[in-house]
UniProtKB/Swiss-Prot annotation:
Function, as annotated: Involved in cell wall peptidoglycan recycling. Specifically cleaves the amide bond between the lactyl group of N-acetylmuramic acid and the alpha-amino group of the L-alanine in degradation products containing an anhydro N-acetylmuramyl moiety.
Protein name according to UniProt: 1,6-anhydro-N-acetylmuramyl-L-alanine amidase AmpD
Co-factor(s): Zn(2+)
Biological-process GO terms, alphabetical: cell wall organization; peptidoglycan catabolic process; peptidoglycan turnover
Protein EC: 3.5.1.28
Reaction(s) this enzyme catalyzes, per UniProt: Hydrolyzes the link between N-acetylmuramoyl residues and L-amino acid residues in certain cell-wall glycopeptides
Domain N-acetylmuramoyl-L-alanine amidase: from-to ranges: 30-171
Family under the similarity heading: Belongs to the N-acetylmuramoyl-L-alanine amidase 2 family.
Record localization: Cytoplasm
PANTHER family, alphabetized: 1,6-ANHYDRO-N-ACETYLMURAMYL-L-ALANINE AMIDASE AMPD, N-ACETYLMURAMOYL-L-ALANINE AMIDASE AMID
The record's free-text note on cofactor binding: Zn(2+) is required for amidase activity.
Length: 184
């Protein structure tokens, strides 16, 4: 695994970049103060194939899989995806608002997309995440916290924490203790 070096003007300096059209400007970019951990797999329970890239770019082909026909018109994105092998792709500049949290609330404040960074792990609620993913997530988190100091350990949450009636990610197999033990 290679170490993540830095963030410059909201972009990781040394990772794969694919621009998603599914974002807009934050109301206040200086207010970035929450990190939200998600999981995604397309099709469900399947990994690889590049379908998350297609989905976040609005290019998912509904004919490829029955599930895609249900979701291909959704306009969603995350700031980054960490694949099973640990590779990180950034889709949205951290200073912009990705559309990952939906209806959400953190400590009484709604619209978490306004002040949150969203990280997707390629995974599901049916199996553990990989060592490579934990390594990359820990490295990425430390670089994000250095660049956005309002994000502290107590402001790192799962999607399930900000949308508890709608979402379960990052799920039962996400090892919060392992992850947070290496976050500085």
């Amino acid at each position: 695994m290679r170490k993540i070096k830095d963030i410059e003007k909201g972009l990781l300096t040394d990772c794969r970049q694919i621009q998603s059209p599914h974002f807009d400007k934050r109301p206040n970019p200086q207010d970035i103060s929450l990190l939200v951990i998600h999981y995604i797999s397309l099709p469900p329970e399947q990994f690889g194939g590049g379908y998350v890239d297609d989905f976040f770019q609005g290019k998912l082909d509904p004919k490829i899989h029955p599930y895609f026909a249900e979701i291909y018109q959704m306009r969603v994105s995350a700031h980054c995806l960490i694949e099973r092998n640990g590779r990180i792709t950034q889709y949205v500049n951290f200073n912009d608002r990705a559309w990952h949290a939906g209806v959400s609330n953190f400590q009484g404040r709604e619209k978490c997309n306004d002040f949150a960074i969203g990280i997707e792990l390629e995974g599901s609620n049916e199996q553990p995440f990989t060592d490579a993913q934990y390594f990359s997530l820990q490295e990425l988190t430390n670089v994000i916290m250095k660049s956005y100091p309002k994000i502290t350990k107590d402001r790192i949450v799962g999607h399930c924490d900000i949308s508890p009636k709608r979402k379960i990610d990052p799920g039962q197999y996400f090892d919060w203790e392992r992850y947070l033990s290496s976050v500085k």
